[in-house]
């Protein structure tokens, strides 16, 4: 058996996305504060994998959840409270994907070290190697982008980042994703878990760790829903400022703002996107089925994911 440490795993994965090395309980972990963060690697000649994680939730939260799949097949979901799980590979070569798939608004991900933490992966025979590169799309957003409330009204257990509109779209595009998205967040409203507004979480991984931005093929922005309690003038100023930040951070990458599925601040987003000379993704009629009038349920997520993939395919050619 070979044990892959957090540092070894970090060297394997591409893109690094929002993963970083963080010390917890006097040991290194492969850590992320983002629901929907993904690992991709090849298991070469491995019989079985054991993934070891911390039960790192808030004491008042349900268990965090991870999901995994082999070769793009069915996703399987695992409770972090069990601290480990097995993946049967049966030798040969297989693409393994692991995604952070459930947490709670109570988890203090920003300043309380209650993000997702992988301690090691054990491989029985064979070895782990980096996966072949595929197109990378960064998605900046809120709980809808992260994958909350897709399967129902229960925190963590009903989250589905693996099959929400982002997960659906990247599968159809044979791409992968980096999610810069936090529940309840906006350009004016702070997110849950102690997370600040989007202008601040864009460039940081938690309260003390800055993010070295990746170089994706595309950047998609889906923000605005959570800012609806603020005035139009406030939103216009903050969204304008945020677009300036994103274009500065990704100066040579196509950046595509989306109108939220609820059409919140649609006219403002159209106007400001035009001001910044960016292409706009219109979404009127994309999603006809919701969990709670704002978050697409699985049917709505699949529907909107197909439509988004169709739009983004023109930018990945």
Can you say where each PLM-predicted feature lies in the sequence?
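Short glycine/proline-enriched coil/turn segments at helix->beta-strand junctions
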Residues: 45-47, 92, 172-175, 251, ...
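Solvent-exposed, flexible loop/coil residues
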Residues: 122, 192, 298
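A structural signal for isolated positions on well-ordered beta-strands in alpha/beta enzyme cores
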Residues: 97, 138, 178, 254-256
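Alpha-helical cap/lid subdomain in secreted, periplasmic
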Residues: 71, 200-317
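N-terminal secretory targeting modules
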Residues: 1-140, 145-154, 158, 314-317
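Conserved SGNH/GDSL esterase-like catalytic core that processes O-acyl groups on lipids
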Residues: 34-36, 147-234, 263-264, 295
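Conserved beta-strand scaffold positions in the cores of enzyme catalytic domains, especially
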Residues: 139, 177-179, 280-282
């Amino acid at each position: 058996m070979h044990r892959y440490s957090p540092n070894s795993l970090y060297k394997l994965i591409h893109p690094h996305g929002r993963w970083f090395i963080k010390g917890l309980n006097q040991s290194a972990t492969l850590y992320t504060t983002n629901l929907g963060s993904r690992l991709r690697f090849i298991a070469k000649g491995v019989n079985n994998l054991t993934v070891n994680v911390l039960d790192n939730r808030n004491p008042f939260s349900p268990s965090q959840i991870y999901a995994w799949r082999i070769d793009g097949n069915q996703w399987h979901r695992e409770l972090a409270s069990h601290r480990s799980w097995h993946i049967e590979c049966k030798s040969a070569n297989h693409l393994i994907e692991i995604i952070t798939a459930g947490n709670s608004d109570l988890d203090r991900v920003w300043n309380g070290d209650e993000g997702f933490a992988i301690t090691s992966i054990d491989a029985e025979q064979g070895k782990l190697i980096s996966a072949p590169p595929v197109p990378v799309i960064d998605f900046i957003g809120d709980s809808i982008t992260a994958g909350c409330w897709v399967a129902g009204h229960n925190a963590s257990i009903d989250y589905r980042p693996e099959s929400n509109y982002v997960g659906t779209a990247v599968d159809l595009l044979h791409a992968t994703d980096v999610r810069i998205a936090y529940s309840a967040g906006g350009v004016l409203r702070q997110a849950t878990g102690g997370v600040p507004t989007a202008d601040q979480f864009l460039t940081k991984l938690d309260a003390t760790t800055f993010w070295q931005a990746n170089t994706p093929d595309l950047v998609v922005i889906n923000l605005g829903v959570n800012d609806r309690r603020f005035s139009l003038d406030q939103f216009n100023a903050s969204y304008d400022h945020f677009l300036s930040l994103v274009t500065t951070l990704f100066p040579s990458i196509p950046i595509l703002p989306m109108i939220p599925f609820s059409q919140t601040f649609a006219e403002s987003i159209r106007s400001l996107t035009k001001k910044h000379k960016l292409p706009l993704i219109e979404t009127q009629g994309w999603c006809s089925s919701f969990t709670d009038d704002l978050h697409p349920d699985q049917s709505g997520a699949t529907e909107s994911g197909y439509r988004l993939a169709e739009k983004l395919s023109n930018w990945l050619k």
